[in-house]
Amino acid sequence: MPAKYRALIVTFLAFHIDTLLYYFLVPLLPHYANKLRFSSFQIGILFGSYALALLAATYPAGRLTDRYGRKKPMLWGLFGLMIATALFAWSTNFAWLLLARCLQGAAGALTWVPGMALIADHFPNEERGRALSITFMGANLGVFLGPTLAGYLATHFSYRSPFYVGIILIIIDTLGRLFFVEDVVNVEKSETIPIRCLLGHSRIQVFMIAMMLATVLWSFLESVLPIYLDRRFLSTPQQIGWIFGFLAVMHGLTSPIIGSLTDRIGRPTVLRLGLWAMIFLIILPSWMPSSLAVGLLLGGIGLATTFIISPCSPGVAAEIEQMGSRAYASGFSMLSFSYSAGMVVGSFLGGVLVGPLGLSVSLGCLSLLCVGLLVFSYQVEAHPSLN
């Protein structure tokens, strides 16, 4: 099998297992809340700690990946994920669970950053968008399957059983990273790109803001819509799960298609199409007449999210190549930083906006953020000297 397809399989599996294990915790929250007497504040801290650890670890992960290659950091990440998963299975107090969640976030950075860099190494610019989107489809499959599998195992066996299955999956993932991953470049220390160069590049700024904005929108909806659906339509937990599952499925299934589109018509064009759609779609959930209508609308939002996210990784890789470097991980660490920051900001906005402003006005504010990025994107394209 060609090396690039081995890299694609390993990265697909890595992203899938990382996301699957992240979402294992969702159906187990009632257990922690009831049996271990955790407060809603502690539950919120558990979720937020993952994003904060991911946020803190992303740039160091990029520097390590560009210095030591892709394979070693991916294996280090699995070691941390193994410890975190074992802690989840056996922890009986908040402190150990918090440590597990932080380790899981740091391990995620050592999976995503070198994983994206591995794909960029093996696939040329004209194939990179589709390849990266296929790996993201693995992550979205984890979003859909994680809560379902964990809920089934916890119901029919024990609340520890999902994490035992997780350890088995990590072992399989380890074998793949050990024997299938091949580093095709050795990036020397002198070739790493200073962070100020990345942050000062206007096109990279556009892609970073786009990644953060898409994650803000997603996290905002996850934090406020379940309560809205419960109160307005009396939706059951299962119905809410299917509604958000449809969002994840639409995003995941369309990723390879939109990824190929970015390779054909250009990353900025695809990004702007997504922003134009999101400007109008994001204001509509509070106007839907039924939970079914909300679910169908979320499918459209999932598709628009794909248009926004898919151009980001291959776009950053292309800009790094134009700088005369192959230090992709440094650029991808900035995207991962934006992603994790978006998780934190989206949940925060859901908590502070909806109460005083209401859902409709809050969604209108998010639409204005999309307008702002769209204007900035056109400005950057109209003034190439900014790059």
Regions found by a protein language model. Name each.
Residues 28-40, 224-238:
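Short amphipathic helix-loop junctions that connect adjacent transmembrane helices
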Residues 168-186, 376-380:
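C-terminal membrane-cytosol helix-exit motif in multi-pass small-molecule transporters
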Residues 1-2, 182-208:
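Juxtamembrane intracellular "pre-TM" segments in multi-pass secondary transporters
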